[in-house]
Amino acid sequence: MTDCQHQAEAYEAHSSRRDDAESPTSTKRVAASRRFDRRTALFGAGAAALAATAAACTTASAPETPVRPVPVAPTTLPATAATPPSSESGETQAHILHVARRLSFGPTPQLLDAIQAAGTTSWIDQQLAWESIDDSAMDGILASYPRALMTATEISANLDQKRTRQEMAAATVARAIWGKRQLHELLVDFWSNHLNVNINHDATTRHKPTDDRDVIRRYATGRFADMLVASAKSPAMLLYLDQALSRADGGRLPIENYAREMLELHTVGIDGGYDEADVKEVAYLLSGWGIANRNDGGFQFRPQWHNMGPLATGGDVLGWRPNGLTGVAAGESLLVYLARHEKTATRLAYKLAVRFIGEHVQPTDGVVSSAAQAYTANDTAIAPMVRSLLLSPEFRASSGRKMRRPIEYFASILRSVQLQWDPARATNLSSTVLSQLSLLGQVPLAWETPDGYPDFDAHWTTAGAMVARWNLATLGSNSFGAPSPQFDANRILGTPAPATVGDAIDRAAIAILGEPLEASSRAAILSASGQTSTTPWKTTSNARAVIAYVLQTPQNQIR
């Protein structure tokens, strides 16, 4: 068993112990300051840290530290930020690179070419119309992770919670690495956190693949009202927040977990104007919403458990009244009302602005207001809201203001080294995803509490987190032990082979980053090296060291 597999086993054991020990609403939510100098934190300990990182990783050979490169511009490499504006699009390479970084899981030469050929606006529109993008090549890859595509009934027929969790994580990351629907995948990640369901909660594991497919992926650019109703009826959500057990018959008090989280997290927000009376009214309204059975049942309404409570005698929820509706129809009506609420529009627009523009954005900013208006004008449609944000001057000016979270960083590394898919190594990838992202603190779909993984950079830049990133970069430069032809340094460094170490560094930077290294990164590498930029290039083993250093730089931590 490999180290990665041992770490995956430890993670699964820890997850299983948590299943019965904690309610998803019992754990205190994360809170942290957003005041943070991103570049300073990313650069960390500089050259010493880079050298220590290389020494700490036992799966790659100790690198011969490269130095300041001699400027080169091989014709086989993608254009750099210094390239003049394209005569066809009139857009600078810097903005094309910004779009590729921010709206994908990492730029590749092929992606940069595609964006330049289409123009950024057309490319964004193509990505938002994700169903029209031919991504059939992913079918063969996902076939290696069949549980990610199964129904709860199929999973229950051969129950293996651990394998289901592993395959869901691997399928999620595989789509990020090799999929063509890059913006859709980023939005899937966003909505998976907004409507968070912890896959490690024992009751939800078998239902999460269906929730991922029929709620999150289906509506990622559609109407939020439809997504919210689908989520409220999702067996995964109903079990995660105990709604499946909520009954208000015979004098019983309904469970308030889902009602509270739906108001606070999914719709209007904690400052949305609701109070405890509203929470109780929503809990009564949704009493009887459940599933046919825990193992494989779909949504089922039990009228005998249902009680309209205070809403039956003139109550209201933020201005909504049932007007004679009861049961499922009343619950759906409230959910659609809340999806259309102005507070929900502003909150969703703000969260998406933080995700795609940066933490400096405020809820009262014009860019948020414009996106909220697009959402409202299109009856809660998500795509127009996202488009408003991505075509804004604020988005264009936000280059370098977002850090890659661990999943994004992991996927970007394997996209950077142009790892080729090998079905024979599907299990290895699954173990690697689980072990490495566990170390980095972001296993897909595994955040314990209903608020989803944090979206502020300070959470991801502790000293331990940065060391783990540097170690991951060294592992990634070795493609986690993947043999050729999965990994080929020539694909990254180009042909003919570099003449000097400096030449190799420059080529690696252009291929991985899409632009030259910053002076500060070059200086950090130089300080850990006794070489010069004219040191002759020796063997392909050096390529992994050069690639590792470029992957470790602050530029590669930024979206």
Question: Predicted regions span which residues?
Answer:
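Short, low-complexity, disordered segments immediately C-terminal to signal peptides
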Residues: 61-76
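Extracytoplasmic/secreted proteins, especially bacterial periplasmic and envelope-associated proteins
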Residues: 91, 95-102, 110-114, 118-126, ...
